[in-house]
Amino acid sequence: MMRKLFAGIAIGCLTLTAPPRAAEPNWHLVATVAESCSCTISCPCNFGGEPNRNPCEGNRLIAIKSGHYETTDLAGVSFLVTFNMRNWSKIYLNDKVSAQQEKAVEALLPIAFAGFHRGMLSFTKAPITMDITEKRVRFSGPESSVDMEVMSGFGGKPVQIKNLPNPAYQDYTQYKSVAHKHASDKATWSHSGTNGFTSTMELGSKN
């Protein structure tokens, strides 16, 4: 009986002294996403499927239109992700961001971009160029460049896909790569006529 009493007291003490769980960071972002990969059109990965070309090689631009991480404003922040899907990624943050924004993006990567963060080989600041219009998208970083054109459908309007099963792929507009290139010590590729898209990404914490 005494042993049970002492055990109960011990458990109670542990419960009382256990440190509180850290609160989830407060964050939210709305971003324009532009990507080209090596899959044929339209990339099945965006529907929750498997790539139709392995390895899937891609470049994704994330341009944050509005958002924050805790008290840091992220509006205007952009970064480029070069990736070999599920294997590795190299992330280039626009060199115009502040030191505080850089820290915020680095903290946000494992939360909002966990897939890219898991295989991250490098996270560096670098010059990034981007030119996004309704008919043409061009963006580049130190080792990668993408040039893609919109695909027209019925009535000459852009081909769009609604309600894809991922918050990063809303307002999805279909593009086709004109030139999609990467050259580094890790890999080299050059694709044309492959999948491309622009979309809106909106994500945030629950608090």
Question: Where in this protein do the model-derived segments appear?
Answer:
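Positively charged n-region of N-terminal signal peptides that target proteins for export
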Residues: 1-5
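Bacterial N-terminal signal peptides
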Residues: 7-15
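Sec/Tat signal peptide C-region and signal peptidase I cleavage site
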Residues: 18-24
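Beta-strand-enriched cores of mature, soluble protein domains
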Residues: 24-207
